[in-house]
UniProtKB/Swiss-Prot annotation:
<dbReference type="GO" id="GO:0005576">
    <property type="term" value="C:extracellular region"/>
</dbReference>
<feature type="binding site">
    <location>
        <position position="85"/>
    </location>
    <ligand>
        <name>Mg(2+)</name>
    </ligand>
</feature>
<feature type="binding site">
    <location>
        <position position="27"/>
    </location>
    <ligand>
        <name>Mg(2+)</name>
    </ligand>
</feature>
<keyword id="KW-0456">Lyase</keyword>
<dbReference type="Pfam" id="PF13653">
    <property type="entry name" value="GDPD_2"/>
</dbReference>
<comment type="function">
    <text>Dermonecrotic toxins cleave the phosphodiester linkage between the phosphate and headgroup of certain phospholipids (sphingolipid and lysolipid substrates), forming an alcohol (often choline) and a cyclic phosphate. This toxin acts on sphingomyelin (SM). It may also act on ceramide phosphoethanolamine (CPE), lysophosphatidylcholine (LPC) and lysophosphatidylethanolamine (LPE), but not on lysophosphatidylserine (LPS), and lysophosphatidylglycerol (LPG). It acts by transphosphatidylation, releasing exclusively cyclic phosphate products as second products.</text>
</comment>
<comment type="similarity">
    <text>Belongs to the arthropod phospholipase D family. Class II subfamily.</text>
</comment>
<keyword id="KW-0442">Lipid degradation</keyword>
<feature type="active site">
    <location>
        <position position="5"/>
    </location>
</feature>
<keyword id="KW-0443">Lipid metabolism</keyword>
<dbReference type="GO" id="GO:0046872">
    <property type="term" value="F:metal ion binding"/>
</dbReference>
<protein>
    <recommendedName>
        <fullName>Dermonecrotic toxin LapSicTox-alphaIB1c</fullName>
        <ecNumber>4.6.1.-</ecNumber>
    </recommendedName>
</protein>
<keyword id="KW-0325">Glycoprotein</keyword>
<feature type="disulfide bond">
    <location>
        <begin position="45"/>
        <end position="51"/>
    </location>
</feature>
<dbReference type="GO" id="GO:0090729">
    <property type="term" value="F:toxin activity"/>
</dbReference>
<feature type="glycosylation site" description="N-linked (GlcNAc...) asparagine">
    <location>
        <position position="250"/>
    </location>
</feature>
<dbReference type="GO" id="GO:0016042">
    <property type="term" value="P:lipid catabolic process"/>
</dbReference>
Length: 273
């Protein structure tokens, strides 16, 4: 999965997919009542990027729905996964469940079209704080009470705080999560970060009793760091330059071993060689 980083304006969906992304990451900010409000990152952000592009969250979802609904004039067949980077740092811990419920209702109405031929992309809820695990239970409760528990089949999870892998496993246990787990590791492109924790996550993914299904690394903009991440065995790379990742995947060393994921590749299934 080539994951376009910080895609917060509707116009950027086309831009990143046309550069080779089959997945995008979108920032979600919340108001003081735990309603998802804007797709917005703000300053500071990655080096070389404009930090302030934004849409109202529900408007972004409508644009995203068009981009992922077969038959729509804006449809991109290859856009198959969306990571919502949930900026819950502005919330109190006891608002996490409400944030999950409100997020689910927004998605149900504006992205999934109330279960009636909505957008088809898989969705990852990426949460920066392990203490906010109730966002997951709230999300699930809302979809169930709205009569669409089947949409949970399209939803996965990530805790993005680079926490100890044992602590992450524990948070999932508390949230009742037993699958659909993506594990991120990374740092802003302005700084360097080694691959030690990525290798631990990959080892967990590949062990018989691990909780992780997929591992992705962020934010990778250079060819050599792309090669290093692929050599470590990641499933996804988040980038500001999807064309760079696509170029490396075309190199002879990687062409035989990796391919770009399509809609038929289940993102919740651990890949077995």
């Amino acid at each position: 999965w080539i994951m376009g980083h910080m895609v917060n304006a509707i116009a950027q969906i086309d831009e990143f997919v046309n550069l080779g992304a089959n997945s995008i990451e979108t920032d979600v900010s919340f108001d003081s009542s735990a309603n998802p409000e804007y797709t917005y990152h703000g300053v500071p952000c990655d080096c070389g990027r404009t930090c302030t592009k934004w849409e109202h969250f529900n408007e972004f979802l409508k644009g995203l729905r068009k981009a992922t609904t077969p038959g729509d004039s804006k449809y991109h067949e290859k856009l198959v996964l969306v990571v919502f980077d949930l900026k819950t740092g502005s919330l109190y811990d006891n608002q996490a469940s409400d944030a999950g419920k409100k997020l689910a209702k927004s998605l149900l109405q504006n992205y999934w079209n109330n279960g009636n031929n909505g957008g088809r992309a898989y969705i990852v809820l990426s949460i920066p704080n392990l203490a906010h695990y109730k966002l997951i239970t709230g999300f699930k409760e809302a979809l169930t009470s709205e009569g669409h528990p089947e949409l949970m089949d399209k939803v996965g999870y990530d805790f993005s705080g680079n926490d100890d892998i044992g602590d992450v496993a524990n948070a999932y246990k508390k949230a009742g999560v037993t699958g659909h787990v993506w594990q991120s590791d990374g740092i802003t492109n302005c700084l360097l970060r080694g691959l030690d924790r990525v290798r631990k996550a990959v080892a967990n993914r590949d062990s018989s009793n691990g909780y992780i299904n997929k591992v992705y690394y962020w934010t990778v903009d250079k060819r050599q760091s792309t090669r290093d991440a692929l050599d470590a065995g990641v499933d996804g790379i988040m980038t500001n330059y999807p064309d760079v990742i696509a170029d490396v995947l075309n190199e002879s060393a990687y062409k035989a071993k990796f391919r770009i994921a399509s809609y038929d590749d289940n993102p919740w299934e651990t890949f077995k060689n």
